[in-house]
């Protein structure tokens, strides 16, 4: 099967104003908007100055309140609403904030934030003494955030340790070099991350998290059921509408070019098969619980979108007969350091992988 639809290249990199990095800035702008709400769900005092420092004009104006989410929306396209997206990110941020605080109340003092972007939890949450927070992301992202927060006079509320690594590669080695202790229970998060990874990279990441965790470790992420064809079409249409609205404000960001569609192992099932005890809540229910209207049915191409928190019970891998390995993709090389819209990212299923029943060992954890 040939799959084309992303301009992502194997090993591509970014800063906070381009490609995947720009989505981190967009999410930080949403957190700034949520912080300014009349009855805020969250308080991220660093979101607005971080967005301002990145320098994307429309996101700075949204973060500062000069523009509102409704200013961005097209009234004739209510299904592609920046207002609803801002509500979603407020609820999501609160979910992960509470996940980490619950983990520390259970005695966990080691935290790993995967793809931390402009996440400022190491500075704004009330971590107990002796808590170590590891943040992993691309070098340009981590350098920018660390420098900007230092210039703001911000001080971490935990022992913050920066890990610069690509989550598609051997990040466990870099994490270990920063002092990570695999004998201690850990609270992990993969917030807004997995759909930006190719299917095999997602599985490797979850395998690595499991291999580096002892029982009673915790993990939080989102789990999305695989797209049905008509759902994918509607999601792509919504992303295109939002991209056109962003372009009207001088911001060129099209999520269609950044996320990976196509079948993959569903994270919740994958974690359960590998010894994690799951607690799930639908996005719709979490919106309602926090005082927002749920999406109307016709708005939602992904009704099976869950927030997942998990606790590791057993430390061994399973390969149930009902679970197929993720497709193995051969990556067609893109031009080096180029994200040209004319250069599609093509992936071809490996026939050899279809006959495989055992996943390869995680990178960085081989003997």
Curated annotation (Swiss-Prot):
GO terms for biological process: methylation. One of its GO terms (molecular function) is methyltransferase activity. Transmembrane segments: none annotated. Its EC number is 2.1.1.-. The keyword 4Fe-4S does not apply. Residues 348-358 have a biased composition (Polar residues). Belongs to the UPF0677 family. S-adenosyl-L-methionine binds at residues 137, 166-167. This is Putative S-adenosyl-L-methionine-dependent methyltransferase MRA_0734. Gene3D superfamilies: Vaccinia Virus protein VP39 (3.40.50.150). Residues 348-367 are annotated as: Disordered. Signal peptide: none annotated. It is an enzyme of class 2 (transferase). Keywords: Methyltransferase, S-adenosyl-L-methionine, Transferase. Exhibits S-adenosyl-L-methionine-dependent methyltransferase activity. The keyword Methyltransferase applies. It comes from the Bacteria.
């Amino acid at each position: 099967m040939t799959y084309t639809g992303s301009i992502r290249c194997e090993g591509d990199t970014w800063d906070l104003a381009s490609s995947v990095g720009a989505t981190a800035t967009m999410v930080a702008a949403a957190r700034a908007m949520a912080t300014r709400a009349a009855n805020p769900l969250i308080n991220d005092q660093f979101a607005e100055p971080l967005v301002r420092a990145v320098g994307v004009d429309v996101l700075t104006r949204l973060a500062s309140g000069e523009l509102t989410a409704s200013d961005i929306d097209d009234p004739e396209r209510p299904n592609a609403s920046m207002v609803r997206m801002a509500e979603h990110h407020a609820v999501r941020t609160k979910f992960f904030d509470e996940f980490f605080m619950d983990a520390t109340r259970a005695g966990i003092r080691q935290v790993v934030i995967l793809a931390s972007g402009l996440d400022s939890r190491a500075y704004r949450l009330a971590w107990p003494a002796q808590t170590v927070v590891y943040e992993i992301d691309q070098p340009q992202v981590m350098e920018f955030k660390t420098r900007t927060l230092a210039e703001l006079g911000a001080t971490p509320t935990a022992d913050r340790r920066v890990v610069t690594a690509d989550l598609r590669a051997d990040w466990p080695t870099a994490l270990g070099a920063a002092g990570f202790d695999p004998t201690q229970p850990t609270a992990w998060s993969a917030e807004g991350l997995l759909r930006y990874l190719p299917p095999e990279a997602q599985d490797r990441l979850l395998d690595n998290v499991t291999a580096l965790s002892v029982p009673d470790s915790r993990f939080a992420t989102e789990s999305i059921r695989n797209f049905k064809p008509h759902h994918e079409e509607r999601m792509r249409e919504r992303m295109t509408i939002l991209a056109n609205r962003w372009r009207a404000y001088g911001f060129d960001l099209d999520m269609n070019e950044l996320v990976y569609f196509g079948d993959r192992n569903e994270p919740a099932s994958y974690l359960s098969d590998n010894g994690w005890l799951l607690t799930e809540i639908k996005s719709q229910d979490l919106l309602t619980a926090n005082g927002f209207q749920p999406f109307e049915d016709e708005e939602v191409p992904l009704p099976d979108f869950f927030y997942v928190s998990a606790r590791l019970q057993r430390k061994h891998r399973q390969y149930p007969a009902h679970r197929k390995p993720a497709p193995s993709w051969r990556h067609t090389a893109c031009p080096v350091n180029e994200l040209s819209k004319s250069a599609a990212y093509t992936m071809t299923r490996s026939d050899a992988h279809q006959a495989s029943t055992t996943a390869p060992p995680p990178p960085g954890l081989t003997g």
